[in-house]
Amino acid sequence: MELLIQLTSLLLIVIAGPLVIALLFLKQGNL
């Protein structure tokens, strides 16, 4: 069960990471 939680958290980090960076770049570009 812990392995599944670790995999899902890792997947969230892998997906959310680039999204947050893209949002930051968009905000800087709009300014």
Swiss-Prot record:
List the transmembrane segments.
5-25
The answer to keyword Cytoplasm applying to this record is: no
What is the residue range of the signal peptide feature?
none
Per the record, the GO terms for biological process are: photosynthesis
UniProt function note: A core subunit of photosystem II (PSII), probably helps stabilize the reaction center.
Compartments where located: Plastid, Chloroplast thylakoid membrane
Major location (coarse): plastid
Q: How does it assemble?
A: PSII is composed of 1 copy each of membrane proteins PsbA, PsbB, PsbC, PsbD, PsbE, PsbF, PsbH, PsbI, PsbJ, PsbK, PsbL, PsbM, PsbT, PsbX, PsbY, PsbZ, Psb30/Ycf12, peripheral proteins of the oxygen-evolving complex and a large number of cofactors. It forms dimeric complexes.
Membrane topology type, per the record? Single-pass membrane protein
Q: Which GO terms describe its cellular component?
A: chloroplast thylakoid membrane; photosystem II
Keyword annotations of the record: Chloroplast, Membrane, Photosynthesis, Photosystem II, Plastid, Thylakoid, Transmembrane, Transmembrane helix
Which named protein is this? Photosystem II reaction center protein Psb30
Q: NCBIfam families, alphabetically?
A: PRK13686.1
Q: Which InterPro entries match?
A: PSII_Ycf12_core-subunit
Organism from which the protein derives: Phacus acuminatus
Domain of life of the organism encoding this protein? Eukaryota
Q: Which family does it belong to?
A: Belongs to the Psb30/Ycf12 family.
